[in-house]
Amino acid sequence: AHSLFTSGSALKPPTIDEVVKLAGVAKGTFYLYFKDKYELMDQLFLKKLAECVNSALFKTRQHFAGRQTDDAERVNTFLDNVFVYIEENKAFLPLVRDRVSSCYRMMLKGREAELKDAYGSLVKLFLAHGYTEYESEMNIYMLVSMLTSVSCDSAVHGEPYKLDEIKHGMQRLVNKLLANKEERDYDI
């Protein structure tokens, strides 16, 4: 089923008939496990998202093993590892496109331990930098939204900007978000 959702258009996901035919199961069996194809898409997305987060966390922890570093460097290294995963798993991107709200809800529900841990760590990080819990959660949502939407076109088509350019822009944004409170307070 994964190949059906990653090879087609995000605007026209495969039909239930296509899914059950490829999986070699009856429609009734499909409906025992999933309410509809969108629930299946959410499950596939959650699995790939957890794989991405787990891979990025593992590489980040390896990179900083036994070393002290500042929070911005740690988050930027994590984001670099997410970009590496995206670059190596482009087939996953059609599943990601337009699924930011689902991604955020899944992180909040914490159905996957990796997502729950990563989300909790990010909230604590922002709290330590003077943000309220509400502001911390909003910052995470904005980062996830930007990361997923801009990385899809950049990774698949190389436009309007290359993935490396997007990565550097995200790093600057993280550095600003994690700057001292006095440095980031501004009037709009």
Language-model-derived ranges and their functions:
Residues N54-L57, Y85, C103-G130, E137-Y141, ...:
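Amphipathic alpha-helical packing segments from all-alpha helical-bundle domains
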Residues A1-F5, V82:
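Short hydrophobic clusters on alpha-helical segments that form packing/core surfaces
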Residues N81-R105, V123, S149-V156:
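Amphipathic alpha-helical segments used for helix-helix packing
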Residues I16, F45-F58:
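Short, basic, alpha-helical segments at the C-terminal edge of helix-turn-helix-like DNA-binding modules
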Residues Q43, F58-E87, L143:
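Hydrophobic alpha-helical connector segments
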Residues P13, L93-R97, E135, Y186-D187:
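Short, hydrophobic secondary-structure boundary micro-motifs
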Residues S7-E39, Q43-L44:
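Helix-turn-helix
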Residues F126-L173, R184-I188:
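Hydrophobic/aromatic-rich alpha-helical bundle segments in the mid-to-C-terminal region
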